C-alpha cells in the first residue's frame, strides 16, 4: 500500500513530508530551548531552513542524476531515517554540515559530464571544507572526492 502511494512522484508527497518534518523539528526544538527571544527564534528558523534545504537538495540530486525512477521513495527514506533518529536534529552543526556535504555531492555527481572538471573538483572540495568547519568528521567526505578524482581523470 505504501509502495503504491509513493510510486509516482507528486507534489502532495512533498507537502506531506514537509509538514511531518516541520512538526518533528518543532517538537524536538520546543522541548530543548527555554528562551523565546528574537535571536534564538532566528537561529531555529535558520536551522529549519537548512534542514529542509538538505531534504530538497537530496531529492534534487537523486532525480537529476536518475538514481531512482520518477517516484518519492528517496524523500520517504530521508524522512523515515530522520523520524527514526530525531536526536540528529538536536545538533545544529550537523544539520549545516549535512547541507554543505549535499552541495558537495551535487558537484561530484555532475562530474560524469567531464566538462570543467577542475572547477567542479574545487567546488566540491570547498563545500566539504565548509562542512568540516561545522563538524570535524565531515572531513571523511574527502575520500569519495579523491576516489572520483582518480576514477574520472
What are these regions (language model features)?
Residues 122-136:
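Membrane-interface alpha helices of multi-pass inner-membrane proteins
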Residues 76-95:
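Aromatic- and kink-enriched transmembrane "portal" helix at the membrane-lumen/periplasm boundary
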Residues 26-36:
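Juxtamembrane "helix-exit" motif on the non-cytosolic side of transmembrane helices
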Residues 1-19, 68-69:
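N-terminal membrane topogenic signal
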Residues 62-81:
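Transmembrane-helix signature of polytopic, membrane-embedded enzymes
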Residues 141-153:
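Perimembrane helix-loop-helix junctions
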Residues 66, 104-119:
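Membrane-interface transmembrane helices that cradle and orient dolichyl/undecaprenyl
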Residues 49-65:
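Transmembrane-helix motifs of polytopic, lipid-linked glycan transferases
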Amino acid at each position: 500500500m505504501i509502495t503504491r502511494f509513493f510510486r509516482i512522484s507528486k507534489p502532495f508527497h512533498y507537502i506531506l513530508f514537509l509538514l511531518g518534518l516541520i512538526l518533528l523539528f518543532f517538537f524536538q526544538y520546543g522541548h530543548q530551548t527555554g528562551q523565546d527571544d528574537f535571536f534564538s527564534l532566528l537561529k531555529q528558523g535558520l536551522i529549519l531552513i537548512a534542514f529542509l534545504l538538505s531534504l530538497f537538495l537530496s531529492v534534487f540530486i537523486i532525480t537529476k542524476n536518475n538514481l531512482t525512477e520518477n517516484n518519492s521513495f528517496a524523500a520517504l527514506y530521508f524522512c523515515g531515517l530522520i523520524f527514526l533518529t530525531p536526536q540528529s536534529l538536536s545538533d545544529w552543526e550537523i544539520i549545516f554540515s549535512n547541507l554543505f556535504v549535499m552541495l558537495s555531492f551535487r558537484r561530484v555527481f555532475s562530474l560524469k559530464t567531464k566538462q570543467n572538471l577542475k572547477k567542479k573538483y574545487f567546488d566540491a572540495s570547498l563545500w566539504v571544507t565548509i562542512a568540516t568547519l561545522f563538524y570535524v568528521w565531515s572531513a571523511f567526505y574527502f575520500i569519495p572526492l579523491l576516489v572520483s578524482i582518480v576514477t574520472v581523470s
